[in-house]
Amino acid sequence: MTIEHGLRVPMVGKPQATAAYAKEVEAAGFDFLWMPDTPLLAGLWRDVYMHLTCAALETKHIRLGPGVTNPITRLPVTVGSAIVTLNEVSEGRAELPYGSGYSSAYITGRKAASLQMMREATELWRSIFSGALTDLGGLEIELDPPHPDIPIIMAASGPRTLQLAGEIADGVLIMVGAHPGCIQWALEHVETGMARAGRDRAEVSRTLVITACVDDDRQRAIDLMRPCVGNLLRHSLVNELLDRAGLAVPKLPDNTPQPYPDLGHAVDWEEAKRVTAWIPDEVVVAMNALGSGLEVAERAAALAECDIDAIWWRDHGTWEYPNALFRGLVDEVFPKL
């Protein structure tokens, strides 16, 4: 099965540098490029839409979007305005991946969005993009011209969010690791939501978030990627996921230190590796795509068999471009698919 491939690129350096990098990513054959949206994370990240706009000006075909935005750190109407503008700059290549903001709302002292907030945001964006008369809360507008083809893609991990995505979104971004058993578990919930709304398969695209490392030194890859599993093991759904992967749930240590600003975005990755040393190798291997180019290609092929449409690839990093993963995918993985 042929699927699409995207790359996660963080906002490091100036927007002009990101634009040049996006041009390289496009030339390498990637279908989409999404950039995270956590404003001023650790004082180092910048505004995602500035970077995306510059990327749009230097590319011609690759689709662009925040990966992912949320209705908390930006008001939904502000997100809608930014995405419409990006769609105009890129001549129809904008996408709207969004989630609850669990990894970004905390920096402002707020909680992640509720399911009701995500439903309301989706309805607002769909109304705005369609050009329908839309009440923004204090003023009614009709978008001129409308942009009805911007896809609204909901990021989801838990059962209720996966079901909501299947019910109302144009696509679902599945964030449950890289084991086919976990993906099938997630898709069962997506399909429950689709059935509830009377939707068919073609109405909801399926994209996987896959954290990956292409390295012939398998143990080195495991050690590098170990922190990427840490947050998942503290999630309420860990028992179900690891059961689907045929693994036992490891015992969490008490009072584990938290790297700055958080485990998934640690400025000091060596510290992140130290505080997650308790995670067994087999869990790291199950939840990431890692190893040689052949091993990563075999994992990608197994995931494609789960009836998905795309993989959004990301590395472990936060503070630099994903150069090693980029080259590893292009040179060693994609030729084997």
For each predicted feature, which ranges?
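Hydrophobic faces of well-ordered beta-strands that scaffold small-molecule active sites
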Residues: 5-9, 33-35, 63-67, 94-98, ...
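Alpha-helix-loop-beta-strand connector modules within alpha/beta enzyme cores
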Residues: 46-69, 128, 192-196, 327-337
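Glycine-rich, proline-tolerant flexible connector loops at the mouths of alpha/beta enzymes
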Residues: 34-58, 70, 102-104, 176-180, ...
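N-terminal beta1-alpha1-beta2 module of alpha/beta enzyme domains
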Residues: 1-59, 63-66, 150
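Active-site mouth loops of central-metabolism enzymes
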Residues: 3-16, 67-77, 146-157, 212-215, ...
